[in-house]
Amino acid sequence: MKSYIEPFIASKALSQNSQKAYRYDLQQFCQLVGERVNQDKLLLYQNSIANLSLSAKKRKLSTANQFLYYLYQIKYLNSYFRLTDTMKVMRTEKQQAAIINTDIFYQKTPFVWGQLISLLILELGLTPSEVAGIEVANLDLNFQMLTLKTKKGVRVLPLSQILIPFLEQQLIGKEVYLFEHRGIPFSRQWFFNHLKTFVRSIGYEGLTAQKLREQFILKEKLAGKSIIELSDILGLKSPVTLEKYYKS
Protein backbone atom coordinates (compact mmCIF):
# COMPACT_ATOMS: atom_id res chain seq x y z
CA MET A 1 0.00 0.00 0.00
CA LYS A 2 2.95 2.31 0.64
CA SER A 3 3.80 2.23 -3.05
CA TYR A 4 0.59 4.15 -3.78
CA ILE A 5 1.46 7.12 -1.57
CA GLU A 6 3.51 8.98 -4.19
CA PRO A 7 1.02 8.43 -7.07
CA PHE A 8 -1.75 9.64 -4.75
CA ILE A 9 0.16 12.78 -3.79
CA ALA A 10 1.02 13.41 -7.44
CA SER A 11 -2.68 13.23 -8.32
CA LYS A 12 -3.42 16.23 -6.10
CA ALA A 13 -2.50 19.88 -6.53
CA LEU A 14 -0.52 20.37 -3.34
CA SER A 15 2.15 22.81 -2.24
CA GLN A 16 5.55 21.47 -1.23
CA ASN A 17 4.73 21.82 2.47
CA SER A 18 1.39 20.07 2.01
CA GLN A 19 3.07 17.25 0.11
CA LYS A 20 5.47 16.71 3.02
CA ALA A 21 2.60 16.69 5.52
CA TYR A 22 0.57 14.22 3.42
CA ARG A 23 3.60 11.98 2.94
CA TYR A 24 4.42 11.97 6.67
CA ASP A 25 0.83 11.21 7.72
CA LEU A 26 0.35 8.48 5.12
CA GLN A 27 3.61 6.74 5.91
CA GLN A 28 2.51 6.50 9.54
CA PHE A 29 -0.94 5.35 8.45
CA CYS A 30 0.47 2.58 6.25
CA GLN A 31 2.94 1.56 8.95
CA LEU A 32 0.13 0.91 11.41
CA VAL A 33 -2.51 -0.45 9.04
CA GLY A 34 -0.21 -2.59 6.90
CA GLU A 35 -1.02 -3.86 3.43
CA ARG A 36 -4.47 -5.27 4.15
CA VAL A 37 -7.08 -2.76 5.23
CA ASN A 38 -9.88 -3.86 7.54
CA GLN A 39 -12.07 -2.28 10.19
CA ASP A 40 -9.96 -3.52 13.09
CA LYS A 41 -6.78 -2.00 11.69
CA LEU A 42 -8.53 1.29 11.05
CA LEU A 43 -9.71 1.29 14.64
CA LEU A 44 -6.13 0.66 15.70
CA TYR A 45 -5.03 3.70 13.72
CA GLN A 46 -7.87 5.75 15.17
CA ASN A 47 -6.72 4.78 18.64
CA SER A 48 -3.13 5.78 17.86
CA ILE A 49 -4.14 9.38 17.13
CA ALA A 50 -6.74 9.69 19.88
CA ASN A 51 -4.51 11.85 22.09
CA LEU A 52 -3.51 14.34 19.41
CA SER A 53 -4.83 17.88 19.28
CA LEU A 54 -8.15 18.35 17.51
CA SER A 55 -6.54 20.06 14.51
CA ALA A 56 -3.85 17.38 14.12
CA LYS A 57 -6.42 14.60 14.43
CA LYS A 58 -8.69 16.18 11.81
CA ARG A 59 -5.75 16.60 9.43
CA LYS A 60 -4.69 12.97 9.77
CA LEU A 61 -8.26 11.69 9.39
CA SER A 62 -8.81 13.81 6.30
CA THR A 63 -5.55 12.68 4.71
CA ALA A 64 -6.22 9.01 5.47
CA ASN A 65 -9.79 9.21 4.14
CA GLN A 66 -8.66 10.82 0.89
CA PHE A 67 -6.08 8.09 0.49
CA LEU A 68 -8.62 5.34 1.23
CA TYR A 69 -10.99 6.77 -1.37
CA TYR A 70 -8.15 6.94 -3.90
CA LEU A 71 -7.30 3.27 -3.25
CA TYR A 72 -10.96 2.38 -3.75
CA GLN A 73 -11.12 4.36 -7.01
CA ILE A 74 -8.11 2.58 -8.48
CA LYS A 75 -9.59 -0.75 -7.30
CA TYR A 76 -6.79 -1.54 -4.87
CA LEU A 77 -9.54 -1.84 -2.26
CA ASN A 78 -12.70 -3.79 -3.00
CA SER A 79 -14.64 -1.93 -0.33
CA TYR A 80 -14.72 1.74 0.59
CA PHE A 81 -13.51 2.43 4.10
CA ARG A 82 -13.83 5.72 5.92
CA LEU A 83 -12.55 6.93 9.28
CA THR A 84 -14.81 9.23 11.30
CA ASP A 85 -14.38 11.36 14.41
CA THR A 86 -16.83 9.16 16.27
CA MET A 87 -14.99 5.88 15.69
CA LYS A 88 -13.77 4.38 18.94
CA VAL A 89 -11.76 1.33 19.80
CA MET A 90 -13.99 -1.25 21.43
CA ARG A 91 -13.28 -1.53 25.14
CA THR A 92 -14.59 -3.79 27.81
CA GLU A 93 -15.78 -2.55 31.16
CA LYS A 94 -12.97 -4.35 32.91
CA GLN A 95 -10.32 -2.98 30.56
CA GLN A 96 -10.19 0.78 30.24
CA ALA A 97 -7.52 0.80 27.54
CA ALA A 98 -6.95 -1.06 24.29
CA ILE A 99 -3.86 -3.06 23.43
CA ILE A 100 -1.99 -1.25 20.67
CA ASN A 101 0.18 -2.68 17.91
CA THR A 102 3.74 -2.16 19.15
CA ASP A 103 5.67 -3.48 16.12
CA ILE A 104 6.70 0.03 15.13
CA PHE A 105 8.44 0.51 18.49
CA TYR A 106 11.12 -2.02 17.47
CA GLN A 107 11.98 -0.56 14.08
CA LYS A 108 15.13 1.41 13.33
CA THR A 109 15.04 5.01 14.54
CA PRO A 110 17.47 7.89 15.15
CA PHE A 111 15.92 8.32 18.60
CA VAL A 112 17.60 5.28 20.14
CA TRP A 113 17.53 6.46 23.76
CA GLY A 114 13.82 7.19 23.70
CA GLN A 115 13.24 3.89 21.93
CA LEU A 116 15.07 1.87 24.60
CA ILE A 117 13.24 3.68 27.40
CA SER A 118 9.90 2.82 25.80
CA LEU A 119 10.90 -0.81 25.19
CA LEU A 120 12.00 -1.32 28.80
CA ILE A 121 8.59 -0.10 29.92
CA LEU A 122 6.69 -2.14 27.31
CA GLU A 123 8.72 -5.32 27.84
CA LEU A 124 9.26 -5.22 31.60
CA GLY A 125 6.60 -2.89 32.98
CA LEU A 126 9.20 -0.62 34.58
CA THR A 127 8.52 2.88 35.87
CA PRO A 128 10.72 5.76 34.62
CA SER A 129 12.58 5.85 37.95
CA GLU A 130 13.27 2.11 37.69
CA VAL A 131 14.57 2.57 34.15
CA ALA A 132 16.83 5.38 35.37
CA GLY A 133 18.18 3.15 38.13
CA ILE A 134 19.27 0.25 35.92
CA GLU A 135 22.94 -0.45 36.63
CA VAL A 136 25.31 -2.01 34.12
CA ALA A 137 26.48 -4.57 36.70
CA ASN A 138 22.91 -5.82 37.14
CA LEU A 139 22.37 -6.58 33.46
CA ASP A 140 23.31 -10.12 32.44
CA LEU A 141 22.72 -10.37 28.71
CA ASN A 142 24.21 -13.87 28.47
CA PHE A 143 21.56 -15.26 30.81
CA GLN A 144 19.04 -12.62 29.69
CA MET A 145 18.27 -11.29 33.15
CA LEU A 146 17.98 -7.92 34.85
CA THR A 147 18.40 -7.65 38.60
CA LEU A 148 16.46 -4.58 39.63
CA LYS A 149 17.29 -3.09 43.02
CA THR A 150 14.90 -0.49 44.40
CA LYS A 151 13.77 0.76 47.80
CA LYS A 152 10.94 -1.79 47.59
CA GLY A 153 13.35 -4.70 47.26
CA VAL A 154 15.09 -6.78 44.61
CA ARG A 155 13.42 -8.24 41.51
CA VAL A 156 14.96 -10.50 38.90
CA LEU A 157 13.30 -9.97 35.53
CA PRO A 158 13.80 -12.04 32.36
CA LEU A 159 14.88 -10.18 29.23
CA SER A 160 13.30 -11.20 25.94
CA GLN A 161 15.57 -12.07 23.03
CA ILE A 162 14.22 -9.17 21.00
CA LEU A 163 15.33 -6.70 23.69
CA ILE A 164 18.97 -7.86 23.84
CA PRO A 165 20.32 -6.04 20.71
CA PHE A 166 18.86 -2.74 21.92
CA LEU A 167 20.56 -3.16 25.29
CA GLU A 168 23.89 -4.23 23.76
CA GLN A 169 23.95 -1.07 21.67
CA GLN A 170 23.45 1.22 24.66
CA LEU A 171 25.80 -0.59 27.04
CA ILE A 172 28.87 0.43 25.06
CA GLY A 173 31.03 2.82 27.08
CA LYS A 174 28.75 2.90 30.12
CA GLU A 175 30.36 2.96 33.56
CA VAL A 176 27.64 2.62 36.19
CA TYR A 177 24.15 3.18 34.78
CA LEU A 178 22.55 2.15 31.51
CA PHE A 179 21.51 5.77 30.98
CA GLU A 180 24.31 8.04 32.15
CA HIS A 181 26.97 10.60 31.36
CA ARG A 182 30.34 9.71 32.89
CA GLY A 183 28.76 7.62 35.59
CA ILE A 184 26.08 10.17 36.51
CA PRO A 185 22.45 9.18 35.76
CA PHE A 186 20.40 11.50 33.60
CA SER A 187 17.65 13.67 35.07
CA ARG A 188 13.96 12.85 35.16
CA GLN A 189 13.35 15.59 32.56
CA TRP A 190 15.90 13.97 30.25
CA PHE A 191 13.95 10.71 30.29
CA PHE A 192 10.67 12.54 29.73
CA ASN A 193 12.03 14.50 26.77
CA HIS A 194 13.60 11.50 25.03
CA LEU A 195 10.53 9.32 25.49
CA LYS A 196 8.26 12.10 24.24
CA THR A 197 10.42 12.67 21.15
CA PHE A 198 10.49 8.99 20.25
CA VAL A 199 6.78 8.24 20.63
CA ARG A 200 5.95 11.38 18.66
CA SER A 201 8.26 10.25 15.85
CA ILE A 202 6.32 6.99 15.42
CA GLY A 203 2.88 8.60 15.50
CA TYR A 204 2.00 7.99 19.15
CA GLU A 205 2.18 11.54 20.43
CA GLY A 206 0.62 11.71 23.88
CA LEU A 207 1.58 8.15 24.80
CA THR A 208 3.11 8.53 28.26
CA ALA A 209 5.27 6.23 30.37
CA GLN A 210 2.17 5.40 32.41
CA LYS A 211 0.23 4.38 29.31
CA LEU A 212 3.14 2.29 28.06
CA ARG A 213 3.26 0.52 31.42
CA GLU A 214 -0.46 -0.11 31.12
CA GLN A 215 0.22 -1.87 27.81
CA PHE A 216 2.53 -4.26 29.66
CA ILE A 217 -0.18 -4.92 32.25
CA LEU A 218 -2.81 -5.63 29.60
CA LYS A 219 -0.56 -8.00 27.66
CA GLU A 220 0.51 -9.91 30.77
CA LYS A 221 -3.09 -10.32 31.85
CA LEU A 222 -3.99 -11.51 28.36
CA ALA A 223 -1.12 -14.02 28.58
CA GLY A 224 -2.75 -15.55 31.65
CA LYS A 225 -0.86 -13.95 34.52
CA SER A 226 -2.84 -13.81 37.76
CA ILE A 227 -3.24 -10.55 39.61
CA ILE A 228 -0.80 -11.76 42.29
CA GLU A 229 1.80 -12.85 39.74
CA LEU A 230 1.57 -9.53 37.93
CA SER A 231 1.78 -7.61 41.19
CA ASP A 232 5.02 -9.43 42.02
CA ILE A 233 6.47 -8.77 38.56
CA LEU A 234 5.76 -5.05 38.94
CA GLY A 235 7.11 -4.95 42.48
CA LEU A 236 3.86 -3.69 43.99
CA LYS A 237 3.21 -3.88 47.72
CA SER A 238 -0.36 -4.96 47.01
CA PRO A 239 -2.40 -5.83 43.90
CA VAL A 240 -5.07 -3.23 44.66
CA THR A 241 -4.11 -0.93 41.78
CA LEU A 242 -4.45 -3.87 39.35
CA GLU A 243 -7.97 -4.83 40.39
CA LYS A 244 -9.61 -2.68 37.71
CA TYR A 245 -7.98 -4.86 35.04
CA TYR A 246 -9.26 -8.09 36.58
CA LYS A 247 -12.85 -7.16 37.40
CA SER A 248 -15.31 -9.45 35.63
Curated annotation (Swiss-Prot):
Protein name from the UniProt record:
Tyrosine recombinase XerD-like
Q: What does this protein do?
A: Putative tyrosine recombinase. Not involved in the cutting and rejoining of the recombining DNA molecules on dif(SL) site.
Q: Where in the cell is it found?
A: Cytoplasm
On whether Zinc-finger is a keyword of this UniProt record, the answer is no
- All copies of the Tyr recombinase domain together span 85-248
**Belongs to which family?**
Belongs to the 'phage' integrase family. XerD-like subfamily.
The UniProt entry lists the main location of this chain as cytoplasm
Q: Does the keyword Membrane apply?
A: no
Q: Name one GO molecular function term.
A: tyrosine-based site-specific recombinase activity
Which GO biological-process labels does this protein carry? DNA transposition
Q: Which UniProt keywords apply?
A: Cytoplasm, DNA integration, DNA recombination, DNA-binding
**Do you know which Gene3D superfamilies this protein is assigned to?**
1.10.150.130, Intergrase catalytic core (1.10.443.10)
Q: Which GO terms describe its cellular component?
A: cytoplasm
All copies of the Core-binding (CB) domain together span 1-72
* Active site, renumbered: 149, 213, 245 (o-(3'-phospho-dna)-tyrosine intermediate)
- Which species is the source of this protein? Streptococcus pyogenes serotype M4 (strain MGAS10750)
The UniProt entry, under PROSITE patterns, shows: CB (PS51900), TYR_RECOMBINASE (PS51898)
Which SUPFAM superfamilies does the protein's record reference?
A: DNA breaking-rejoining enzymes
Q: Which NCBIfam families match?
A: PRK02436.1
HAMAP family attached to this UniProt entry:
Recomb_XerD_like
